[in-house]
């Protein structure tokens, strides 16, 4: 059972359902851990997860996982679904008979948070379904201080779930036996039909929103009535007494036993920071980051075999003629050993990993074809519209390749893939944005889980984000993946942020992600115009040996006077202008990995270019964006010189809305860095 819930009742669930020792909870209240033993930053007790193997009445052992989550209500919903789907895929459980996602919601959040609808919409989609989710709504008839009339425009908080046409049960929260009956009915429905089911437990919050809150300020009449009501354990005890099921002495004995247990557990507490407990399938994965280069080349003979398999349409399959021609050109470049473009290198990286037994899951909006019509991982018959997936036809023994066009969602879809990555550390799990600009629709998932999950909860992830990035005159919402925001989230090695400039570098980067002994999220600024740029190609030899290089240096032919450091596609414009002007005094350095900052590589380079009088950082993003503010202090400390900024001036918008203005600004940047057009 994969369980997600907010903070209310969380400690109760941990100790009474997942059987977490009371003594561990007492230690969390005392905050008495040795600071020297603390790993990462930690989190408050109401956010931490837990998992255990619980033996139920019939002797069956059920693994129960309560996911760690942030205070942002409902944000954990798609994470639960993703982890559940990963476990189902690993267990060969497509109908969800062995793995059950269970979500506990609040009434105000279920009606109000948009991510709920995004998660519900995944329920029956091929790439996301988990055999149905059981939703339990703790309906306290209030959201902090907000009454239902101000919290939703529908009669019931559950009405958003009507989109799925599934059962919604409303049950009285003071009737435990009725609630149990409904839960059994809900689970039977889910098991038989493989769909979601919703249980609305109509109850109340006895105290305020938190330990120090006073509800009488805003709901005096409601809380007068609540405080007149006996607690539910008293009501249920009285019902059992009335039916002569138990005696008063037995009830008192139970109460005494609970209090004695709590006292004993409090006395026995030993507040030692708990050791990491990983989910299944994490054996052999290291937590420590290393900048040691990982050999990721693939022998030419094997790449040729793989290229023929992924670029050959089977007999009898009527593929679109333009696609057949495209695949033919891809194969031709591999056979010639030169001119391998971005999509071709990606396909070869995927094929090589799959043939080595490493599964791949690739999702995103329009990702099968690719936003820029570059990938074509799924071919569609012109006669029957049946699909053929070349990367699933590599031969016996290959790993599973899953490519799905996602629903039109960023936050929910990215949260799902983050959850999936928690359950499949040995695979390459990728989420691609349609344009990198749209990643801010999922900013909560990036901030709360991807960037900080390991620090807060010791939950590493190897998720890869592919974010098309680069100014090309397409306006402010089709230009920037907000590189600067990812860099602001970087603290040491929590995120790998890369901006590769060649297909070979991308090839090695993808392979490195699953070949290195640890797992860290990888954020890749991917290209748009470079997908078809005549200079953005690699040779077969570039793929057959070597590794991903965090820094690429291209020195001039003469004495170096100025060093231009940049990252991303602008390097090709700088190279072209340098050639046009025969500016042999310029050295060009490409920062392919921005974080963790490649200090060693740049130190060595600075030593070789010690004669340079000037070091410049060149970027096409505005001065308050891009990598400038992250790179400036680090680069200056290495070269022991002032680093000059060359780029657009600061701007509220990431790019101009008019193509002509873009061209004028871009030319000004290139001219300042290298010189005006000859």
Q: Can you describe what each PLM-predicted range is?
A:
Residues 1-115, 120-153, 159, 164-169, ...:
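Conserved internal helical-beta-strand scaffold that buttresses enzyme catalytic cores
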Residues 130-247, 459-460, 471-484, 516, ...:
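Thiamine diphosphate
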């Amino acid at each position: 059972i994969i369980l997600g819930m907010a903070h209310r009742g969380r400690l109760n669930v941990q100790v009474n359902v997942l059987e977490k020792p009371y003594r561990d909870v007492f230690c969390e209240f005392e905050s008495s851990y040795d600071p020297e033993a603390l790993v990462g930053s930690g989190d408050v007790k109401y956010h931490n997860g837990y998992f255990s193997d619980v033996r139920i009445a019939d002797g069956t052992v059920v693994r129960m996982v309560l996911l760690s989550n942030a205070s942002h209500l409902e944000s954990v919903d798609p994470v639960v679904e993703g982890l559940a789907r990963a476990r189902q895929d690993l267990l060969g459980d497509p109908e969800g008979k062995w793995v059950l996602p269970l979500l506990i919601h609040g009434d105000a959040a279920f009606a109000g948070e948009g991510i709920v609808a995004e998660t519900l919409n995944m329920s029956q989609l091929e790439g996301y379904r988990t055999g149905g989710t059981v939703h339990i709504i703790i309906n306290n008839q209030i959201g902090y201080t907000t009454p239902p009339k101000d919290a939703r425009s529908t009669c019931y908080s559950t009405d958003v779930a009507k989109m799925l046409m599934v059962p919604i049960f409303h049950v009285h929260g003071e009737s435990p036996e009725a609630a149990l009956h409904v839960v059994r009915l809900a689970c039977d429905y889910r098991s038989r039909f493989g769909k979601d089911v919703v249980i609305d437990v109509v109850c109340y919050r006895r105290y305020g929103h938190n330990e120090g809150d006073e509800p009488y300020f805003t709901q005096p009449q409601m809380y007068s009535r609540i405080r007149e009501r006996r607690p539910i354990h008293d009501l249920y005890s009285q019902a059992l007494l009335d039916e002569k099921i138990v005696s008063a002495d037995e009830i008192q004995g139970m109460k005494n036993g609970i209090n004695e247990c709590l006292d004993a557990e409090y006395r026995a507490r030993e507040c030692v920071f708990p050791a990491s407990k990983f989910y299944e399938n994490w054996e052999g994965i290291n937590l420590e980051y290393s900048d040691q280069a990982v050999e990721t080349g693939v022998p030419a003979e094997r790449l040729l075999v793989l290229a023929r398999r992924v670029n050959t349409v089977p007999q009898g399959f009527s593929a679109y003629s333009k696609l057949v021609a495209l695949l033919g050109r891809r194969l031709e470049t591999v056979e010639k050993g030169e001119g391998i473009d971005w999509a071709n290198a990606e396909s070869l990286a995927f094929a090589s990993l799959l043939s080595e037994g490493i599964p791949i899951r690739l999702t995103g909006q329009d990702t099968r074809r690719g936003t820029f019509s570059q990938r074509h991982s799924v071919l569609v018959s012109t006669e029957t519209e049946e699909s053929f997936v070349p990367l699933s036809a590599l031969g016996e023994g290959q790993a599973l390749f899953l490519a799905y066009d996602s629903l039109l969602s960023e936050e929910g879809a990215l949260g799902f893939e983050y959850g999936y990555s928690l359950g499949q550390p040995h695979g390459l799990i990728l989420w691609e944005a349609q344009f990198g600009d749209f990643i801010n629709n999922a900013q909560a998932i990036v901030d709360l889980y991807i960037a900080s999950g390991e620090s807060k909860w010791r939950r590493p992830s190897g998720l890869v984000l592919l974010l098309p990035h680069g100014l090309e005159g397409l306006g402010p919402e089709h230009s920037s993946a907000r590189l600067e925001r990812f860099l602001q989230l970087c603290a040491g090695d929590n995120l790998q942020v890369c901006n590769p400039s060649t297909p070979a570098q991308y090839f090695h980067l993808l392979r490195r992600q699953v070949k290195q002994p640890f797992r860290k999220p990888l954020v890749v600024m991917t290209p748009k115009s470079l997908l078809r740029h005549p200079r953005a190609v690699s040779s077969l030899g570039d793929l057959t040996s070597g590794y991903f290089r965090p820094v690429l240096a291209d020195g001039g032919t003469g004495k170096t006077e100025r060093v231009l450091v940049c990252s991303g596609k602008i390097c090709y414009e700088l190279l072209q202008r340098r050639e046009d002007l025969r500016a042999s005094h310029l050295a060009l350095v490409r920062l392919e990995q921005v974080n963790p900052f490649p200090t060693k590589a740049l130190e060595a380079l600075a030593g070789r270019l010690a004669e340079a009088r000037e070091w410049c950082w060149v970027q096409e993003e505005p001065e308050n964006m891009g990598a400038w503010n992250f790179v400036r202090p680090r680069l200056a400390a290495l070269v022991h010189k002032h680093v000059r900024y060359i780029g657009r001036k600061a701007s509220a918008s990431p790019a101009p809305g008019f193509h002509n203005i873009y061209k004028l600004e871009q030319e000004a940047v290139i001219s300042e860095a290298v010189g005006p057009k000859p």
